[in-house]
Design a protein with these regions (language model features):
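Beta-strand/loop edge motif enriched in small/polar residues
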Residues: 1-186
Length: 186
C-alpha cells in the first residue's frame, strides 16, 4: 500500500465516517478491541477498496456499516473477530487481482490463538457477499460451544457454499443457474 490506513485505538469511540473513500493503503480501517456495549464506529455511504491487507478489520468492538462497499483486498474485505456488528445495504466483493489474494470477502471468527472473542452479533441485511473464489465466506468457530458465535443473514446474495439454518433467511446463493459471468458471453 501507499500508506497505512485508518486505525481506531482501544479508547476511541463514537467515530462516524460518511462519504469516505479509502483506497491504496496497507489496510483500510482497523478497529482495536474495546467494549462492545459502546459504539466504536459508524460507517455510512463509504468505499474501502484496493488495499493490500484487510479492508475492514474489526476486533471485539461495536460497529454499524450502512450503504457501503468494501472491495478488492489482498487479504479479507471484512475480517470480524468477536464483537457486535451490523451491515445493511453493503457490498463485500473480493476480486483483488494485483497480487496473490490471501483472503475472502468475509471472514468471521470467535477465537484466535486459543483466546476467546465472543461474537455476540454479526447481522447482514440486504448485502452482496461475492468474489472470484468459489467460497467467499470463511468462518472460524471455536470448538468451545460456550463462546458466542451469533450471525444472521437476511435478503442477501452470497457466493459461498449453500447452508440452511434459521440464521440464514431469504438468501440467494450465487450459482451458475442464477447468474451469468458476462465476461464469457457476447
Amino acid at each position: 500500500g501507499q500508506w497505512g490506513g485508518l486505525r481506531f485505538y482501544k479508547t476511541s469511540y463514537e467515530n462516524h465516517l460518511v462519504y469516505a473513500d479509502i483506497h491504496g493503503g496497507s489496510f483500510g480501517i482497523r478497529c482495536d478491541s474495546s467494549m462492545t456495549d459502546r459504539r466504536k464506529l459508524t460507517l455510512e455511504s463509504s468505499l474501502i477498496r484496493q488495499v493490500s491487507g484487510n479492508g475492514l478489520e474489526l476486533t471485539s468492538c461495536q460497529v454499524v456499516v450502512g450503504n457501503s462497499e468494501i472491495s478488492n483486498a489482498g487479504e479479507n474485505c471484512v475480517s470480524l473477530l468477536g464483537g457486535d456488528y451490523t451491515f445493511t445495504h453493503c457490498t463485500l466483493a473480493n476480486y483483488f487481482s494485483w497480487n496473490v489474494r490471501k483472503g475472502v470477502a468475509l471472514q468471521v471468527r470467535n477465537e484466535l490463538d486459543d483466546t476467546a472473542y465472543p461474537l455476540s452479533s454479526a447481522i447482514f441485511r440486504n448485502c452482496i457477499i461475492a468474489g472470484s473464489g468459489t467460497d467467499e465466506i470463511n468462518g472460524g468457530r471455536s470448538k468451545n460451544e460456550n463462546i458466542a458465535f451469533n450471525y444472521y443473514f437476511s435478503h442477501c446474495l452470497i457466493n459461498s457454499i449453500e447452508e440452511e439454518n434459521d440464521k440464514i433467511v431469504n438468501v440467494i446463493w450465487e450459482k451458475d443457474d442464477n447468474f451469468m459471468l458476462m465476461d464469457n458471453h457476447t
